[in-house]
Amino acid sequence: MDISRAEQRILHHLAQGGRIEIKREGKTIAEIRCFTRDGWVYPGVDLELFRKLKRKRAIRSSSGRPYRITERGLYLVRSELDNR
């Protein structure tokens, strides 16, 4: 299954140790933030992209914690060179 360039970027940040945090107002999602492993906020996540990643089972949250990448997500993400 192919993934878009934006999905690829987000999954790569998550594979390196990032997380996606959501804030809710009642049952609706009010805000979505993607944090890199260094704690910086990555601005490329919106509600549509978040739902696509959930639908593809690339990210998952357990016990109310932030969303992390799954094994399926690691399979979908193509490796990239990291300059660290």
Swiss-Prot record:
Name of this chain's protein: UPF0386 protein NGR_c10980
InterPro entries: YjhX_toxin (IPR018654)
Organism superkingdom: Bacteria
Signal peptide interval: none
Family: Belongs to the UPF0386 family.
Record-linked Pfam families: YjhX_toxin
Native organism: Sinorhizobium fredii (strain NBRC 101917 / NGR234)
NCBIfam families in UniProt: PRK13687.1
Source taxonomy: Bacteria, Pseudomonadati, Pseudomonadota, Alphaproteobacteria, Hyphomicrobiales
